[in-house]
Amino acid sequence: MRGPQLSIHLIGLPGSGKSTVGRHLARRLGLPFIDSDHVIEQRIGGSIRGFFDREGEAAFRDLEEEVILELTEANVPPQVLATGGGVVIRPGNRTRLRERGTVVYLNASPEEIFRHIRHDQTRPLLQVGSPLDRLRELQRERDPLYREAAHFVISPERGKNVAALVQHIAMQLELAGIRPPSP
């Protein structure tokens, strides 16, 4: 099985909790937390939504792939990495994330995500007439890709708090021998 020094890569739909869970999981595991979307925003000097509107999705995916390559280099120390919801669209990203760490798919339902993000104006792919329908469409399109990349699929239960979810993920990593048991 894998050694205890691997990075943890979180994937899932936009709004599935990757950044929130990632921050708490990193603290729990004593690892740095990186959000690839924040790295991209620093690089472009603005919002992803603005970049999407100006440059288009293809240009964004090119930049995202470049950032994922950098964040998963062999010399990068172990970390918890929250990725953008569409990172799995590019086959190279799926392979890279899977080979360079342990991939955890946060498989939240579109309905649960919608409850959490319905007022969020920062998510470019959800700025449509029916965000819930768009989330369902993204789930249908991307679920097979998330599963292809994932080592673990975690389905957050409605009402389950972040601490309980982080505990569940940490326990799965420990049981698989990927992380040492918590003190």
Curated annotation (Swiss-Prot):
Xref: InterPro entries: P-loop_NTPase, Shikimate/glucono_kinase, Shikimate_kinase/TSH1, Shikimate_kinase_CS
GO BP annotations listed: amino acid biosynthetic process; aromatic amino acid family biosynthetic process; chorismate biosynthetic process
Cofactor: binding details: Binds 1 Mg(2+) ion per subunit.
List of residues binding substrate: D37, R61, G85, R142
CDD domains: SK (cd00464)
Its biological purpose: Catalyzes the specific phosphorylation of the 3-hydroxyl group of shikimic acid using ATP as a cosubstrate.
Subcellular location, record wording: Cytoplasm
Subunit: Monomer.
Pfam families with a match to the protein in the record: SKI
Residues binding Mg(2+): S19
EC number: 2.7.1.71
Cofactor(s) listed in the protein's UniProt record: Mg(2+)
Record-given protein name: Shikimate kinase
Family indicated by similarity: Belongs to the shikimate kinase family.
Enzyme kind, highest EC tier: transferase
Molecular-function annotations in GO: ATP binding; magnesium ion binding; shikimate kinase activity
This protein's encoding gene: aroK
SUPFAM superfamilies assigned to the protein according to its UniProt record, in alphabetical order: P-loop containing nucleoside triphosphate hydrolases
